[in-house]
C-alpha cells in the first residue's frame, strides 16, 4: 500500500507523486550473462548552451520555444543543434502536463555525418511544496524518429523511451534558486535477438532477429544547479550534469543474418549547462 487514503490535499498530492514515482525503476531488462561489458575509462566533458522563451498565453497555459547547442568532449566540435516547441498546462498547484516537439540535428563523432531526428514528447509532473522546499516528480515519454540511414538490425528507427526525474529545489535564497535532481532513462524497444556464442572459435552463431522488444535502463543523470531570477522576465540557469550511460552495441551485416559483435558499453561524462530564459 503506497499511502493511506485521505481527503487531506497534501495526502492526495503525495499519493499522486508516489504512484508516478513507481515508474522510476520500470522497464529494466535482465542482462545476458554471456554478453561482455566494455567500460569506457575516459570521463567526457561536454557543454550545453540554450536560449528559451516562455509565454503565459492564458491562466495555467504556457507556450515555450528553445534552441540548444551541445558540444563534444572538451568543446572541440558541435555535437548537435536542437530546437523545440512546447505546450504545457498547470491543472492545479500540484499537477502539470504538457507536450513537446523537438528537432535534433546531431553530428556523429566519428565521421561528422549529419543525423537528423524528430522527437515528440508528453509529460506529467507532480509537485509538492514544503515551506521553502519544492519536490517534483516528472515522467516524460519520448517517441524519436531517426531520419537517416541505419542498419535496422542494429538500431531502432522509431525509439520509445521513458525519462523519470525526481527534483528538489530551495526557494529561500531569492533571487537564486538552487536545485538537484536525478533522472533515469529507460528504453522500451531496442533490437531483440537469439544467438549462441561459440567460445572455441570466439564467434556468435545461430543468430535470429526477434524484432524490437528489448527494454533496459540506459542512462542515469544527476544534476546540481541554480536558477538566477535576474528580474521577473529574465533568468539564467547554471548546472553541472553527470551521466552514466549504458548501451547494447550490436554489429550485424545489412541482411540481418550474421551477428559479428555484441557487447554492453558503459561510459561516463560531465556536462556544463548554461541557459537563458525570457518569460512573459
Positions of the model-derived regions?
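Repeated loop/turn-to-beta-strand initiation elements of outer-membrane beta-barrel proteins
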Residues: 59-65, 93-99, 131-135, 174-178, ...
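Transmembrane beta-strand segments that form the barrel wall of outer-membrane beta-barrel proteins
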Residues: 33-39, 60-75, 80, 96-109, ...
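Outer-membrane beta-barrel transmembrane domain signature
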Residues: 140-257, 277-280
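Residues that define the transmembrane beta-barrel architecture of outer-membrane proteins
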Residues: 43-49, 79-83, 116-120, 154-162, ...
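Sec/Tat signal peptide C-region and signal peptidase I cleavage site
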Residues: 28-32
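Outer-membrane beta-barrel domain signature
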Residues: 36-41, 72-76, 109-114, 151-157, ...
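Hydrophobic/aromatic-rich structural module bridging two neighboring secondary-structure elements via a short loop
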Residues: 77-133
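Residues on the lipid-exposed face of transmembrane beta-strands in outer-membrane beta-barrel proteins
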Residues: 49-55, 85-89, 99, 122-128, ...
Amino acid at each position: 500500500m503506497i499511502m493511506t487514503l485521505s481527503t487531506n490535499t497534501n495526502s492526495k498530492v503525495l499519493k499522486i507523486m508516489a504512484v508516478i514515482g513507481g515508474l522510476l525503476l520500470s522497464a529494466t531488462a535482465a542482462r545476458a550473462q554471456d554478453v561482455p561489458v566494455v567500460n569506457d575509462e575516459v570521463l567526457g566533458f561536454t557543454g550545453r548552451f540554450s536560449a528559451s522563451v516562455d509565454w503565459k498565453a492564458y491562466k495555467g497555459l504556457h507556450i515555450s520555444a528553445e534552441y540548444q547547442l551541445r558540444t563534444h568532449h572538451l568543446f572541440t566540435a558541435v555535437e548537435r543543434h536542437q530546437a523545440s516547441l512546447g505546450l504545457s498546462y498547470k491543472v492545479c498547484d500540484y499537477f502539470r502536463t504538457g507536450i513537446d516537439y523537438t528537432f535534433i540535428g546531431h553530428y556523429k563523432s566519428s565521421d561528422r555525418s549529419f543525423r537528423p531526428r524528430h522527437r515528440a514528447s508528453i509529460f506529467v509532473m507532480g509537485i509538492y511544496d514544503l515551506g521553502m522546499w519544492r519536490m517534483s516528480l516528472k515522467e516524460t515519454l519520448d517517441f524519436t524518429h531517426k531520419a537517416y540511414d541505419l542498419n535496422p538490425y542494429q538500431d531502432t528507427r522509431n525509439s520509445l523511451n521513458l525519462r523519470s526525474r525526481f527534483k528538489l529545489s530551495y526557494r529561500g535564497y531569492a533571487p537564486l534558486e538552487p536545485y538537484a535532481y536525478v533522472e533515469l532513462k529507460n528504453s522500451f524497444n531496442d533490437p531483440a535477438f537469439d544467438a549462441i556464442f561459440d567460445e572455441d572459435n570466439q564467434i556468435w552463431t545461430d543468430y535470429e532477429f526477434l524484432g524490437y522488444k528489448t527494454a533496459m535502463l540506459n542512462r542515469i543523470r544527476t544534476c546540481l544547479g541554480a536558477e538566477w531570477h535576474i528580474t521577473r522576465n529574465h533568468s539564467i540557469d547554471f548546472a553541472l550534469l553527470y551521466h552514466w550511460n549504458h548501451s547494447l552495441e550490436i554489429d550485424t551485416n545489412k541482411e540481418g543474418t550474421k551477428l559479428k559483435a555484441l557487447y554492453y558499453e558503459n561510459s561516463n561524462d560531465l556536462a556544463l549547462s548554461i541557459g537563458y530564459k525570457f518569460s512573459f
